[in-house]
Amino acid sequence: MPSTDSSTKGTQDVAIVGLSCRFSGSATSANKFWDMLCNGESGHSETPRFNPKGFSDPGFRKQNQSATAYGHFLQQDVGAFDSRFFGITPEEALAMDPQQRMMLEVAYEAFENAGMTIEQLAGSRTSCFIGSFTSDYREMLFRDADAAPRYTVTGTGVSMLANRVSWFFDLRGPSVALNTACSSSLVALHLARRSLQSGEADIAIVGGTNLMLGSEMFTFFSNLNFLSRDGLSRSFDASGEGYGRGEGVAAVILKRVDDAIQDNDNIRAVVRGTSTNQDGKTKAITLPSLDAQIDLIRSAYKEGGLSFNDTTYFEAHGTGTRRGDPVELEAISKTLCVDRPTNSKIIVGSVKSNVGHTEATAGLAGIIKAIYMLEKGIIPATINYSRPLPEFDLNSSLLTIPVETKPWPGTSVRRISINSFGFGGANAHAVLDDAPSYLASKSLGNGTKDANSNAPVLRTNGSLVNGNGANEDVQTSTEQLSFLFSGQDQQSLDRNFETMVQHIQTKSFSDSRSELQYLVDLAYTLSERRSRFKVRAEVVASSVTQLVSKIQERSFARVNNDLANTKKSIPAEERTCELKRRVLVDLPAYSWDHSSTYWAESRVSKEFRLRKHPQRSLIGAPQPSYGENEHIWRGYLRLSEEPWVKDHQVLGAIVYPAAGYIAMAIEAAQDIADKGRKVSRYNLRDVQFQAAAVIKEDVPLELIIQMRPHRSATRSTATSWLEFSISSCHNEKNLRDNCFGLLSIEYESSQDSSMALEQEREDALVLDKHRRTAEVCHTTQSPKALYQELASVGLNYGEAFQQISEISKTDGLSSCRVLSYVPDRFSTPNVIHPATLDCMIQTIFPALSGNHTPIHAAMVPTLLEEMSVASRTPNAAASFFRGSASARYSGAREMLAEFAMVDQDNKLSVTARGLHCTAISEATNPRTEQDEDGRRNICSQLMWVPATGVDSVEQVQNKATAPTQTFPPHDQDILILEGDHAYATALSDALMSLDQGKGSYIPIPKSFLRASLQDLEGKTCIATLEMGTSFLANAATDGFDTLKEIVRRCSRIIWVSSSTEPIGSVITGLARTMRNENAGLVFRTLQVPSQDMYDSENLAEVVSQLAASPTMDSEFRLEGGVLRVSRVLRDTKTDNMVASMARNGGPEIRLSTLSQVGTAQKLALPRLGMLDEIYFEADETANGLLRDEEVEIEVKASGVNFRDVLVVMGNVSDDLIGHEASGIISRVGSKVTSFRVGDRVCAIGHGCHRSVYRSTADLVHKIPDGMSFEEAATVPLVYTTAYTAIIDLARAQKGQSILIHAAAGGVGLAAIQIAIHLGLEIFATVSSEPKRQLLHDHGVMEDHIFNSRDISFAKGIMRTTTGRGVDIVLNSLAGEQLRQSWHCLAPFGNFVEIGIKDIITNSSLDMSPFAKDATFTAFEVINIMHKDPKRMANILRNVFQLLGNRSVKPVKPLLSKPISEVGEALRLLQAGKHMGKVALTWDRGQTIPMATTVVKPVLSDTATYVLVGGFGGLGQSIARMFADRGARHLCILSRSGARSREAVETINKLENQGVQVQSLACDVSDEGSLRTAFETCKIEMPPIRGVIQGAMVLRDISFEKMSHNQWHEALKPKVDGTWNLHKLMLRDLDFFIILSSFMGIFGSRTQGNYAAAGAYQDALAHHRRSQGLKAVSLDLGLMRDVSAFSKKEALSGPFKDWQEPFGLREVDVHGLLDHVIASEMTAPSTIPAQILTGFGTAREAEEAGIEPPYYLEDPRFSLLHTTIVEAQQDTATQQQPAATPPDLVAKHTTGDLLRQATSTEDVTDLVLEILIVKVAKHLEQNVANIDPEEPLYTYGVDSLVAIEFRNWIMKEFAADIALLDITAEEPMFDLVDKIVAKSKFLSVPS
């Protein structure tokens, strides 16, 4: 870097000779810009360009929301433009970007300021470099391209910014428009300077433009956190959080210095150096580079040969960001401050604090500021600065920030550096010197003259020469001067006069000489250095006063063009002085004609720009509407902005909740509500939830809501209701309708109005029902249990959707407390938040589950009939609601519910009625292993197998296990820790007699044990301390400490104890923990029955082998001389029973023969429309008393109808199927006289698919002789329907015409026969050619048969009837086909609707046909049967009268199938290709799937049940369960009694249920205390029939650190307490259940005492069983929702990981207890004495993503150790196909083909091929027409068909796919991937 400036004469330096600018606020010109800076003012304001309230979010957290409503804006109308001046037509001006227009005006002003005329510029080598960044006008026009003006391409093209200037001024140099973002104009300056230096141009104009016309860039910059919230730029201040945007248009004119001097131009400043560079690869593209900025500054100074030390001021980029400002200050410090004197600080400022960041114009804003600073010698303050940045130590640097305006320091050269950075890394720098010092250093002159300058007048010879700049000495004279003014028209001239007068009047002069100088300069400037326009005027004056006066008086002479073109404007007859004539630089610019504005904005764009509301969290932002009173909102839901949505997961997918759609509709309604009235509530009705909106983690979901007045008619508009629809799109391809419905806004009315009174009464009824519901709900449920239950079926609710805090319930009802969900502070407030509303909806689930009945499937809302939401719903953090709900199952897969919520003031907040929820899955738990039926594997059993035959036993289980081997003993001494009993002495003697090789057995008597502990170190010890006696359980402190020393010192322990007494198992439990706490310890236990202890010699052999064996096993038992080891096995049988109990007595399906069943059967509904899973169950109704008016029919046949299909598929809510049957009367009621046993009859009814059917006699009819049972079973429904429609309702008369739709079906064929009988002209529709032929065979004329697949039949009917139509329509079609049929009616016609689709969907009906006096009637025979059975009986009689006289016959064709093929029969109807009727025969001997129902136990209301430890979480749950099972007397024992709030509440609720509760404080480990408690209980309560022992004390600590007291505290309640219960409760019990723990099975670390106690309890259960007493020990695993471990934070270590995947739910424990109690109440018991639960497998751990449990290292658990990979390998091995003959290949199943695949790609291709074939078959199209890139729903796979597809996928691929996956917006490829991932057939390499 040079230390001094180069000063050679003749230079290529570039001068700035003219400028113009327009900035925000008062800075409407360059002079006013300088005034703003000096006065410390700001152009900051709220945005006038768009409605800031529509785009800014005060919370600033939503994407595409503006962080600010403020900026720095031009005061002028940006649409105003002087188009005539530039010769631009209005049409073209309309299309021009205001940046182009303003650039033209500013360019002219800059040329004018430089003294350059249009004439001089024309054809000149002038280059034009214009920098820009944003194009808001272009974006505005592009918002609505259809409305764009003709010249849009030239008007908005960015290149035109430069080209337009070059074109107008006829500039012939380079013309470049450039965009380097915020550095654009300074880069343009650099390029312009280069063009001058290279000689390709002689003049250059540099421009920059930045207008902020739209909101888009505000929002996009906000996305990247660029903008400050208050719209201010706080340059270098610690409070800076971003920059404030600013508008500005500026231009400067450049010339080479030599040329400027030669042309007598103003040299405002000299550009000494420029440079540009790029940041390169930084951490992010918008982050600055310190190194690049340092290089940038150095390059500029090096290029100019400049010294850093001469620079006093640095005009920094200084946007006010915490990332950019510190880096820039550091770069300045590391360049200009190097080797700088410490007393010469660099002053750093930024113009952005005044006018904001003008982006593309920012560089020129800094340049113009710097020019004025150089000229004026003043440094303006940097405003908005108070505290230095903490990231840069300003105080220790040589930098300072000016906080007040001050003069330039010193008198030397004035030099300024200017920085400008682009946000993409394009940087620019310029160095300016003041003109005087520069010219002085070069010995050059300057032609600059400020009109305020008082520079001395050079004396000359008295000649005043016209504008050549020569210096001649003359004498002073009073000669008058001529001033030339011009304009494009008279108005322009007048405006120029006015601005000039205003300017001149601001001048003051110190003497006449300075006034004369000013006048000479003014005359020179106006005459020679300004463009001359066609309207001109000459003013002659000799003084300023005279000049002003003449202008104001318009005293001037018109000037013709000839005169104007001469250089005679300044008279020179008398030359009195010579003055150097200079161009004045501060004269007012040309006065533009801004009377016209040009703004080509469409309505659509304007509505967007001026929208009233911003994007909000639910509905997004308002959109332009396309209809009167239509409103549209659109937004993008991003999980990063709305994280609460992630907490709503259905079947593993994030699904937008139904409550969200309701909340959206309410928010939209709030937007358009009458602001002059108070809203009371929002009412919704007929809300249909359609396709689910699935949200992906990183893909925003587009949501659109439309709202308009509800058009209930096509010729009018009803305004009381608004119809809304919500759509979504997540793949930028397909929009899907998610929800639609109706909403009305209810406003507050006067309290005495009829509406208010009625509403008050209605609310009172709801509140009363709410109160009564709360009173009857006594069963409590923990919210955690509810949410885990919901998660088990696939409704995975996270924190935001877990706001239910209290639950009480009974069958069908619930009462809950719901907290108001409050999102974080950035979210916009809602009338009601979706999470809050969703949790209100969730209260229906406890009502549905009732008294501990689990929820079987994931159910989601599909229809809401009515809802009301109060407008002032509480949403504060502490607010909550109390609600009541009722719910019931309605059909196979639907629930019907309602609920009401009140706030804390007991005011109604939300009510809902007719909430329909539909099942979309079965109960599953994806995080736990399940069998094929979806049941959870929670139970295990402990099995003892021979130690020598382990392998062969376990081969039966198809698993391997650790071998059990024996080896010769080690050559070492073995110590015998000898007990006192004779058994111990005998064993000791026997051991010592054995040949031990080099070692020997050394006995240590018990009495010497304490003194010999040091001899145990590292030894093998055989402990006989508990042979025949108890050492451990009752050990005193010394004995306990001795035990601890034994365990600590010995390396190998073989402990022998009794298996006959339970106390001998204490050491077994402790040893399990010891092995887990000390991995190096070998601690083996041997349990020996008392009878085997006599054979000491054989026992010694066994013990000797165990002492030396390297076996991995540690627990042994000697039984009958056989040594055994234990293994833990899955207990599938118990699992199945528990699952059945948990399913409220669900079925187990077994094949049975119809004749062998021995009881009546009925067809049961399968799950979720699984036609292949239809089964039969016992018909309990057949066992009840036959009513007096009933008959009993032994069914021989039953008819199948399409309604059966709809019920099974879940599309019609019903619990039973089958509506017609035939058979033989088997019994008659006492009042029945018309039938006898043995009569052949048929019946119409409900649930007729059963072997024995009961019906009232009125609905039964004898069948004629000769009519088969199959025929008779097909008569009732179809004929009663046809008869009712045609004869009863339509009142058909002979000669009338009838249109029968779907005429080839059962009803259609029956209707044809009745119509023929009545003599009607028949028109009919069918769907295929075979059906057409069938009708023709039935006598329908060929030209009267039409197609039912489209609406062509309507044209055919009207054509055939010559426009009259038909008299009767029997309709079963829907939608447009119904509408067309309705319009086919003749005058006075009758339309009879027997379909239900349009009724279910609440479709609208055209009213205009009623003008023809038409009648529309709808009915369903089933409803007549239920509601008017007498009428139904009469119809049935009339039908059989027709059949009897052979007027009609049973419907043909008739397809008969055995009842065992009912699934196939239903599927046939589902396909829609059958003709006639289908009947099922009930012949005995058929094989049917029969369910054996498990019945939950019923507890006696005359017995007492004892619950020990009944006030813990699990104890209270069991108490409630017992009450639900019928118990009415409970004795609850606990150490402290019912002291806790929860215990008291539990007792109160039990007593409210009618349960007598005796709560006694009792220590069960104290036999006396327990006996007293039982005596008290016997006095006040019935006999005790059952005991639950759940007492426990936890004292967790490692055994090494455990005290004697801690040992006994844990043992006493379980060991002593359970023994005492055993002693006192020996006989007369229905059950004795011990709640032990799985921790006693594997030996939980730090719980040796607890494990020992648990092992004792297990042994005691076996002991009681051996004595013929009731007993079961349940080793319960971790609880997920209740008990001491209900809160996950209470668990430590691996238990935290195990709880969720392996833990038990409350419903599991209840199911287990139900099973145990039911089994124990039988004699003998059918279950083992010990049941293990809660043990997870390695595979389950792998699926859960956790480490395998450490207990799996124990050989006892080897059968649970199989991983997923091992399981797949085993499966692959077992399923390896044998060689297949070629002729059998075609018979391979899909499973075979998939298993044979060799790669994932092959499997995927195969599955896709099969799926496409299925879709093509469904559509009856060619396979080639199916595009796998499209979602399934695009091929008509709606919710009904989706069920079929799901069932097909399950059957074909063994893959359980959710309905959401089938109806999702994803392409078929994605569905195929899911099938491949879930198929049980697959085991393919990756």
UniProtKB/Swiss-Prot annotation:
PROSITE patterns under this entry?
A: ADH_ZINC, CARRIER, KS3_1, KS3_2, PKS_MFAS_DH
CDD domains registered for this protein in UniProt: enoyl_red (cd05195), PKS (cd00833)
Q: In which pathway does it act?
A: Mycotoxin biosynthesis
Q: Which BP terms in the Gene Ontology apply to this protein? A: fatty acid biosynthetic process; secondary metabolite biosynthetic process
SMART domains in the cross-refs: PKS_DH, PKS_ER, PKS_KR, PKS_KS, PKS_PP
Q: Where is the Ketosynthase family 3 (KS3) domain?
A: 11-434
State the residue spans of region: Enoylreductase (ER) domain: 1169-1480
Annotated region Catalytic ketoreductase (KRc) domain: the residues are 1503-1681
The UniProt annotation puts the region (Dehydratase (DH) domain) at 618-924
Domain Carrier: start-end pairs: 1802-1879
Spell out which residues are annotated as carrying O-(pantetheine 4'-phosphoryl)serine: 1839
Q: Does the keyword Cell membrane apply?
A: no
C-terminal hotdog fold: annotated span:
778-926
Keyword flag NADP: no
User: What residues does the PKS/mFAS DH domain cover?
Assistant: 616-926
Q: Which InterPro entries match?
A: ACP-like_sf (IPR036736), ADH-like_C (IPR013149), ADH-like_N (IPR013154), ADH_Zn_CS (IPR002328), GroES-like_sf (IPR011032), Ketoacyl_synth_AS (IPR018201), Ketoacyl_synth_C (IPR014031), Ketoacyl_synth_N (IPR014030)
Entry keyword set: Multifunctional enzyme, Oxidoreductase, Phosphopantetheine, Phosphoprotein, Transferase, Virulence
Q: Residues annotated as region N-terminal hotdog fold?
A: 616-750
TM region(s), chain numbering: none
| UniProt GO molecular function | 3-oxoacyl-[acyl-carrier-protein] synthase activity; fatty acid synthase activity; oxidoreductase activity; phosphopantetheine binding; zinc ion binding
Enzyme category, top tier: transferase
**Which Pfam families does UniProt cross-reference here?**
ACP_SdgA_C, ADH_N, ADH_zinc_N, KAsynt_C_assoc, ketoacyl-synt, Ketoacyl-synt_C, KR, NAD-bd_HRPKS_sdrA
The record's domain comment reads: Multidomain protein; including a ketosynthase (KS) that catalyzes repeated decarboxylative condensation to elongate the polyketide backbone; a malonyl-CoA:ACP transacylase (MAT) that selects and transfers the extender unit malonyl-CoA; a dehydratase (DH) domain that reduces hydroxyl groups to enoyl groups; an enoylreductase (ER) domain that reduces enoyl groups to alkyl groups; a ketoreductase (KR) domain that catalyzes beta-ketoreduction steps; and an acyl-carrier protein (ACP) that serves as the tether of the growing and completed polyketide via its phosphopantetheinyl arm.
Q: What does this protein do?
A: Highly reducing polyketide synthase; part of the gene cluster that mediates the biosynthesis of the selective antifungal agent ascochitine, an o-quinone methide that plays a possible protective role against other microbial competitors in nature and is considered to be important for pathogenicity of legume-associated Didymella species. The pathway probably begins with the synthesis of a keto-aldehyde intermediate by the ascochitine non-reducing polyketide synthase pksAC from successive condensations of 4 malonyl-CoA units, presumably with a simple acetyl-CoA starter unit.
Q: What is this protein called?
A: Highly reducing polyketide synthase
